[in-house]
Amino acid sequence: MGKFAKKLERAIRGYTFDDVLLIPQATEVEPKDVDVSTQITPNVKLNIPILSAAMDTVTEWEMAVAMAREGGLGVIHRNMSIEEQVEQVKRVKKAERFIVEDVITISPEETVDFALFLMEKHDIDGLPVVENEKVVGIISKKDIAAREGKLVKELMTKDVITVPENIEVEEALKIMIENRIDRLPVVDKEGRLIGLITMSDLVARKKYKNAVRDENGELLVAAAVSPFDIRRAIELDRAGADVIVVDTAHAHNLKAIKAMKEMRQKVDADFIVGNIANPKAVDDLTFADAVKVGIGPGSICTTRIVAGVGVPQITAIAMVADRAQEYGLYVIADGGIKYSGDIVKAIAAGADAVMLGNLLAGTKEAPGKEVIINGRKYKQYRGMGSLGAMMKGGAERYYQGGYMKTRKFVPEGVEGVVPYRGTVSEVLYQLVGGLKAGMGYVGARNIKELKEKGEFVIITSAGLRESHPHDIIITNEAPNYPLEK
């Protein structure tokens, strides 16, 4: 047998989500009692094992806020200027900040018309009134109603309650409730305004009990960068990004690895590198905190067809996870997940968390454009290797950044629409519910036990058909089993 024929002889068999099921085990575990929290880097623990993809139709600041509030993590895409991405990170960090530091204020000598202008411009309901850096009053929209032309000092509330900067959340809430006020100025020892506490922020903090926050009480957020854009990584790190995600189609590129090593030395944030599908890549990426697995499994990705390269996702996860375990690296499975059951399978195969694109692209918080087709609402969804995304700036992800000036792009993705699915909260509720159900069947109390106890059975195409609803016309669509994908 010749050397080329031997390639086929030693070829491994690859499996993806539809090729396997998990075998049910004897269990005392109830789905309601399982712990789905997971560690994805040394310093970042999520309360649900889900990240939103760094795609320009999936994750911007609104998605990142929603993900963090539900216990996951949003990765803000890089198909924008550095300044725009930095601002997006800052918006997430400010979304539930206990003490707002960049306070919009007004002078008592200004008109109420200008006060109203400031409130509408910044989407707020009230302003501290400041003179010589000291708080002399508070003015709100209800104070201004039908009072055009008057000065702020004539209508402001003058008896202002202030608090010191070391105040605790519960104490601030108690003061606001007892005094029936919505805003609490924070002052230093000299009485100068240094921040503001609002009732809306405190209510939000109490509402989202599963939220993931940093040591300052701010929501966690990640941001994507090119392996060659060190300046972007540094700026995002300074802006407060908790995780830098190096976002490239093929992270086992030696030039990229050299650049990533340099980048790693210049940022303090935790460091995730992707994407890979070969365990040998892990040997060269040990400087990372986690690796992201997936070459071509996504619904909008054509890499496997255009380039002929990839590894079926379950096999890729398992091979990479085995190697990553040797180095103490975390594993994120990126792409190919269609149902909640696929999340269970991905974790049982060795992943610590999954990254979702398609399943979140149809949500209210996703930045994709809404369209109506035959009376039904859809949202735009495209691969970062699609022609539109590459034209906007995503070509570098596929090592085609220099092509525009000399030739046409060679896309590795498509553009389309996905059905509107409601809010992120609604979608994640179903996905996490399915994960918990799967853990109950396997007898896993937590993510670690799911990885240890999960045992696979390989199924045939007949087994797959049997797994889906059959021999029935479905009249009522289930929220976790859409008829239209």
Curated annotation (Swiss-Prot):
Q: Which region is the signal sequence?
A: none
Recorded source organism is: Pyrococcus abyssi (strain GE5 / Orsay)
* CDD domains given in the database record: CBS_pair_IMPDH, IMPDH
Instruction: Give me the residues that bind NAD(+), please.
Output: 247, 294-296
GN (gene name) = guaB
Instruction: Give the family, as the similarity comment puts it.
Output: Belongs to the IMPDH/GMPR family.
| Domain of life, source organism | Archaea
Organism classification, top ranks? Archaea, Methanobacteriati, Methanobacteriota, Thermococci, Thermococcales
Catalysed reaction per UniProt? IMP + NAD(+) + H2O = XMP + NADH + H(+)
Q: In which pathway does it act?
A: Purine metabolism; XMP biosynthesis via de novo pathway; XMP from IMP: step 1/1
Its name, as the record gives it, is Inosine-5'-monophosphate dehydrogenase
